[in-house]
């Protein structure tokens, strides 16, 4: 048995003794439960965190567990967290972001990785704030597709001028239109990883250079 395994066994043994002591003093019907043992954790805020157990990320409140983010953002965030929590390497996390940003700028991303899923929670006429999903839903209606309360709208943000919401098109109609790389870099990928990286010491300038593809100094010494 490795030294690390011995330490883990000792910690788990202490946890069990602690639970037994606490539960013996709790009122009937109440019980403190053990949920899991995690070697590393990363807390963005109290209710937004990621933990790792073996090679599995357990997350709460982060983009990778939310449906209304493009897969490219969720996948990148998951890879970044694995680099930090499993490998202990901010440098690797940085290179992951740089590689994804480069692929987006080159147009080397599958359409499915750009699709945003958002649920329609009310009648379209009841929306006061007309977000991208509402515009995409209305365009689907114009094409004769059924859209109602509870429907999931799948859309892409395409290139062009004007507000982002006006450039939201149903995925069925977006083929060949060309996605907006700046939107997917700034509003999806960087939005999903910037708070994580800034918690490791990356500045706004560092993040700007990442999103533009510039080189920057290593933070491997952090770990």
Swiss-Prot record:
Temperature dependence: Optimum temperature for DNA polymerase is 60 degrees Celsius, functional between 60 and 80 degrees Celsius. Exonuclease activity is higher at 70 than 50 degrees Celsius.
Modes of activity regulation: DNA polymerase is inhibited by replication protein A (RPA), while 3'-5' exonuclease activity is not. Polymerase inhibition can be overcome by replication factor C (RFC) and PCNA.
Transferase is among the record's keywords: yes
Molecular functions (GO terms): DNA binding; DNA-directed DNA polymerase activity; exonuclease activity; nucleotide binding
EC number, UniProt record: 2.7.7.7
Enzyme class: transferase
GO BP term, example: DNA-templated DNA replication
Record bears the keyword Nucleotidyltransferase: yes
Catalytic activity entry: DNA(n) + a 2'-deoxyribonucleoside 5'-triphosphate = DNA(n+1) + diphosphate
Pfam family, one: DNA_pol_B
Transmembrane segments: none
Keyword entries, A-Z: DNA replication, DNA-binding, DNA-directed DNA polymerase, Exonuclease, Hydrolase, Nuclease, Nucleotidyltransferase, Transferase
Miscellaneous note of the record: In some Methanobacteriaceae the PolB protein is split over 2 genes.
Function: In addition to polymerase activity, this DNA polymerase exhibits 3'-5' exonuclease activity.
Record note on quaternary structure: Formed of a complex between PolB1 and PolB2; the exonuclease activity is associated with subunit 1. Probably binds replication protein A (RPA).
Record protein name field: DNA polymerase PolB subunit 2
Gene encoding the protein: polB2
């Amino acid at each position: 048995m490795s030294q690390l395994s011995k330490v883990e066994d000792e910690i788990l043994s202490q946890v069990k003794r602690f639970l037994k002591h606490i539960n013996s003093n709790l009122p009937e019907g109440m019980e403190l439960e053990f949920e899991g043992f995690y070697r590393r954790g990363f807390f963005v805020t109290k209710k937004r965190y990621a933990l790792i157990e073996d090679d599995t990320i357990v997350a709460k409140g982060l983009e990778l567990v939310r449906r209304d983010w493009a897969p490219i953002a969720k996948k990148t965030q998951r890879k970044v967290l694995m680099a930090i929590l499993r490998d202990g390497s901010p440098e690797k996390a940085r290179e992951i972001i740089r590689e994804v940003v480069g692929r987006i700028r080159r147009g080397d991303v599958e359409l499915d990785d750009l699709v945003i899923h958002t649920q329609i929670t009310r009648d379209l006429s009841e929306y006061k704030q007309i977000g991208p999903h509402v515009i995409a839903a209305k365009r689907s209606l114009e094409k004769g597709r059924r859209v109602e309360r509870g429907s999931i709208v799948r859309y892409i943000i395409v290139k062009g001028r004007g507000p982002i919401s006006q450039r939201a098109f149903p995925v069925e109609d977006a083929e060949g239109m060309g996605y907006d790389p700046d939107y997917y870099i700034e509003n999806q990928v960087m939005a999903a990883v910037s708070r994580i990286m800034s918690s490791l010491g990356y500045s706004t300038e560092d993040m700007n250079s990442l999103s533009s593809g510039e080189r920057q100094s290593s933070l491997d010494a952090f770990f």
